[in-house]
Swiss-Prot record:
It is found in: Cell membrane. The keyword Membrane applies. It is a multi-pass membrane protein. One of its GO terms (biological process) is phospholipid homeostasis. The gene is mprF. The chain crosses the membrane at residues 9-29, 53-73, 90-110, 130-150, 162-182, 201-221, 230-250, 271-291, 338-358, 367-387, 393-413, 416-436, 451-471, 490-510. PANTHER family: PHOSPHATIDYLGLYCEROL LYSYLTRANSFERASE. It comes from the Bacteria. GO terms for molecular function: phosphatidylglycerol lysyltransferase activity. Coiled coil: none annotated. This is Phosphatidylglycerol lysyltransferase. It is an enzyme of class 2 (transferase). GO terms for cellular component: plasma membrane.
Amino acid sequence: MTQELKSKLLSFFKFIFATALFIFVIFTLYRELSHINFKETFIQFGKINRLWLVLLFAGGGLSLILLSLYDIILVKALKLKMPLIRVFRVSYIINALNSIIGFGGFIGAGVRAFVYKNYTNDTKKLVQYISIILVSMLTGLSLLSILVVLRIFNASHMIDEISWVRWILYIVALFLPIFIFYTVARPVDRNNRYMGVYCTVVSCVEWMAAATVLYFAALIVDIHISFMTFVGIFVIAALSGLVSFIPGGFGAFDLVVLLGLKSLGISEEKILLALVLYRFAYYFVPVMIALILSSFEFGNTAKKYLDNSKYFIPVKDFTSFLRSYQKDILAKVPSFSLAILIFLTSIIFFINNLTIVYDGLYDGNHFAYYIALAIQTSACLLLILNVRGIYKGSRRAIIYAFISIILIASATIYTYASFLLLSWLIIIFVLLILAYQRAQVLKRPLRFKKLAFMLLLSIFILYLNHILISGTLYALDVYHIEIDTSLLRYYFWMTIVIIMLLVGVIAWLFDYKYKRPHHSIDLTLCDAIIQKYGGNYLSHLVYSGDKDCFFNENKDSFIMYRYKSNALVVLGDPIGNTKSFESLLEAFYQFAEYQGYEIIFYQISDQYMPLYHNFGNQFFKLGEEAIIDLTTFTTSGKKRRGFRATLNKFDDLNINFEIIEPPFTQDFFDELKFVSDKWLDGRSEMHFSVGQFTQTYLSKAPIGVMRDHSGKMIAFCSLMPTYSNNAISVDLIRWLPELDLPLMDGLYLHMLLWSKEKGYKAFNMGMATLSNVGQLHYSYLRERMAGRVFEHFNGLYRFQGLRRYKEKYSPNWEPRFLVYQKHYSLWESMLKVMRVIRHK
């Protein structure tokens, strides 16, 4: 049998053993808990003096400070130049997390190695010392096991009745002398020969502190037994927890304590309550404190420290790669810790709803209590819904949390006024203030998908809350009390109304305060940039007056955009100095992220697609633009006789074409407006991606007009200079609809011939929407669907007809794309673009 196979078999048997043990513990624990009277447990909790609870929780929080002795010994042994106060802070965080997700202490060992390696260049010795600390956590329990075997801590009622307990105690007791002999005989450092002994003493103190906290919890719930006997039971329970490999020994430890105390004639209800209080005091409270410390310990200071650490010098590319992620993780620790604290706060006060309900049952003013219940439930739900926003540093999410904490505090003061809970709310409020000051964004974009998820999550949480309350009331057998049950029925709807009011009012006020209005832009700066660096087929639309412009820091490039529904819809590619485009987009994305806006690019070319890709965007092909090569365009030849026939027809009818240069007279503009109004026939103007029929906009470029034999204007088209590459575009094309003449063909042909005569090289006839989109089997599904629309919905919009019309001019087809951010919906992005185009 190979070594690899042996290793796999050993891992498999370990997994089978741990799983079987876990299942056994769960079933046994379930069987024991099924006999417990939860009503009696709840009543016992109500009788506890709140001052004793505060002292218990304080004791649980302070007990973990003793574990800092491990780190002090480590720092002294390695002679690390690390401030003592920081040693205590880091140690507390490590030990609190290790107690919850320890996995035999390996989590704590890993975090210790990560933190302390920045203070020493002897990594090998550091790892050896950490290994001693890791193993010594068991040696303290081994010392206590010896005392149990010697009956100093008397647990004879368990040892005599359960044979496997005796053998486990013997085995663990033997571990201590072996460990001490080995570490003294073969020390890591001869100058610190007794390192293992010191750590064993600390480990023993650690386990005794945990036993003392549990004993104090037992005394609070009126369990009175000898401390020596109690510690004996605790040691056996702790060994069971270690053997189970479950973090914190959850389940196995509790089961042994329950069985051990129950065999002494103590009621199960009291034991269960003592265990719950112990778990909260020794595990939950330290974790909460550790999360608070993390908010201060790991932030910009830690990141700066890593940058300046003389020991943390990567010697390999892979090390440098890992270091970059370590810095990112450290920077996120404060916001992550606060998010966890907010989530836990919400859970705590959701559970405390039981207290409001219970007190309300026996109070004459039921209505006030259930309003307080609805307010607190709404506030707790808002906290949960904004956990991710707080983690992302959103000011709006933090404001929601502010309001929620105030509402919870108000409900707490009115109902059960717990000093401990109010103190906790004050701490959270202070942390939120600090988070608000360093918040990175105003708000995060609210998308339909996220809104639907939040709605489903809210319903699920409210349902769980209902199950919790109704199940508890049923267990407490309180339904015989005569109350106005309609209040309980309306409680759900009161909660919904309160949430809607809170969310609606805060969102409206926030958007009102930070809404970016449309400002008049500096067209002189746009002119200067376009004249110096050139434009594109859409750059002339900057004069339409319905867009904002975003400039880079050097003021040598800009983009045109419109704000709509929490989105910034950008028209076309950036304009200006191409070397500045990346910095321009980076600044624009930072601005949008801070404001909480989505970014959508409409009608971009494929020239800068790699640049858009660098910003994590997705692409959708909108269609293709028809670009006519004027150097080869002609009306001569057999294939062009249709063009000549059209031109000859207009000549026969004495219909003339001319280009009118600005400035325009008022009479000329009135003629244009008459034709435009007839052509629109009551329809609304399009916006954003086409020009505006305003005197200001039309005065920026020449206009081609066609007049009949009497001099009456019957058609016109406005031009869009591109200011680059000797290209020109057509913009507005309008004619009198009552005339049965090919006026559109006439305008295009005359414009093409005029442009060629003026020396232009290319003429843009505009885009054929959805043209040549999704034609391959390998295309994206969304593009194949768009292709089907192009093929089969020609009656709704003349997709194919538009392309066929432009095909006769033999253009070159250039693709145009919609660019939208990842995790965003294509259809939502398209709808926002359509709203920008359809509405002014």
